[in-house]
């Protein structure tokens, strides 16, 4: 069955607009995906007809809002096949989720002389929190190097583990290269050394189904805004036994059981003790609508369509004169490239003149840029609403830029 891309595009109002007098070709979904009417309408309806502060409210609106929020927690747990909804913490996004783990689990479990393993392709959100933790604790940060094609040098991984390795923190899919890492093998190796595993799933959950139980990771985190949902909301999954042992890292309302000026404070049970303050309930409602939306289309069908489009894009872009493509042949979601010796910002500016939106810069992956010896790259990302015609426009635009700039 053909993927209904035109029907999908009709659900995204922003795709009907023009930029610089030309139809928008939005090739920047890896930075943040556009939102369908179903998400926009769900969040709007909540604020128009159902808004109230959640937790402890005895009135109807509060009770309904609380129920709606907790239903999304259950929905998200099914989406990633968690064992229980109580293994999921609502966070602002992937960055906050990783910082929560570093500041809660990491503070309790990392000691001087321990080590944490990451890779050279990580987003800053999966580098900087571990650097900060290691500096604070006197621990070591070890790095899995890359092959030239943008895949991990897995033959070096076993040597990085030892009896002081406490955590492997690894991206599921690179936000720059599109590399999908072989998590089952990596997690199995971590288990041999008694290490925990955190997976940054920000660039994975929109492209194919994720099963955290099958992966057997300890932590999995992703953002709503890359999954066609609102900004400011994400999910942190933690295995239940581990989550119940973790202390809170932020204090305030909603995360406590009792507060006394003389007896101190006791915490709510997990996951609620990690959700201090008033939550982004509207964002949570929107996230639920986004999960409904991609589930209704079928992640397998979305993935098949995107892979077909990716193959076409790589074939066509390879014909552009003087282009350098980064990353493996088999990839998800993104194509990073440079055009001759021209700075990525210049190329991106020209493309914007043609109504084509790509991302330019270091993509929050400065160590990866340093490894490739470039200050920046252009990145085109492909989502379920992109088309062959938009790929053709990108190729034509780059060919024209090469002709103009030489």
Swiss-Prot record:
Its main location: cytoplasm. The keyword Hydrolase does not apply. Its cofactor is pyridoxal 5'-phosphate. The active site is at 364 (cysteine persulfide intermediate). Gene3D superfamilies: Aspartate Aminotransferase, domain 1, Type I PLP-dependent aspartate aminotransferase-like (Major domain). It is found in: Cytoplasm. GO terms for biological process: cysteine metabolic process. HAMAP family: SufS_aminotrans_5 (MF_01831). NCBIfam families: PRK09295.1, sufS. Homodimer. Interacts with SufE and the SufBCD complex composed of SufB, SufC and SufD. The interaction with SufE is required to mediate the direct transfer of the sulfur atom from the S-sulfanylcysteine. Cysteine desulfurases mobilize the sulfur from L-cysteine to yield L-alanine, an essential step in sulfur metabolism for biosynthesis of a variety of sulfur-containing biomolecules. Component of the suf operon, which is activated and required under specific conditions such as oxidative stress and iron limitation. Acts as a potent selenocysteine lyase in vitro, that mobilizes selenium from L-selenocysteine. Selenocysteine lyase activity is however unsure in vivo. Belongs to the class-V pyridoxal-phosphate-dependent aminotransferase family. Csd subfamily. This is Cysteine desulfurase. It comes from Salmonella agona (strain SL483).
